[in-house]
Amino acid sequence: METEIGDRGVEDGRADECADDECTENGHAPLRRCIVTRERAAPETMLRFVVSPDRVLTPDLAARLPGRGIWLSARRDVLETARTRGAFARAARGQVTIPPDLDRILEAGLVRRMMETVGLARRAGQVTYGFAKVREWIAGGRAGLIIQAEDGSPDERTRLLSGARDLPVAVVPTAAALGAAFGRDHVVHAAMSHGELARRFRVDNERFAGLSGRTVPGLADRSAGLG
């Protein structure tokens, strides 16, 4: 359930009071606090930013860059609020330069990460593509995640998914982007087996979906989200 963004959360926005490795809940993995909503969540589901030496806000989608992190929920409305109401500057304790195309940079970065994961799965034999092969994996119980290109045929998508009602579905923007991960001009349908790579893909896909605000008719209840 999404938290409503209120004035107090924005006014109080600052870098998490906890050090990057100290903010925990009930002894579990570290959590991070969104500078806008003030909600805490697992870091892999959020967006991390750092401020470069020349005070430029820099996305850190892998959460590996040095420096104190600024954390944001991966939602389009939260990003817009942070940009327009000074939350980034407050969290950074000073003025920062925000790239004008920050949303595009984030979306492109997440798509790139998803396609890199597909590439890893391909080399490990954990992913296949094409209508017939995906249906074969579904029928054989090998598919753990279905990947669909948003610009594919809705009718073909419906036929494919009719046999995969219990499987999560992740949507990527274009068949060209998905195809590139397989060394093809375009790929509309793919399936990934259960495992860490599928989980990693789903995490990035959930972040991408939250930022892009895209919805595909008929797939509203088939999200690959991890919740």
Model-derived segments and spans:
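N-terminal cysteine/histidine-rich coordination modules
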Residues: M1-R85, R90
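Helical mechanochemical/support elements of P-loop NTPase systems and associated helical scaffolds
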Residues: P30, G69, T84, L110, ...
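Conserved nucleotide-binding/hydrolysis micro-motifs of P-loop NTPases
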Residues: A41, D77-L79, D151-P154, A176-A177, ...
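Short active-site oxyanion
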Residues: R68-G69, A124-G125, R142-L145, A164-P168, ...
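Extended interfacial segments that mediate partner engagement and assembly in macromolecular machines
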Residues: R76-D151
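Positively charged, polar, low-complexity stretches
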Residues: R122, F131-A132, D155-V171
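Short basic, glycine-rich beta-strand/loop surfaces that mediate nucleic-acid
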Residues: R165-A209
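Charged phosphate-binding loop/patch that engages nucleotide di/tri-phosphates or the phosphate backbone
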Residues: V203-G227
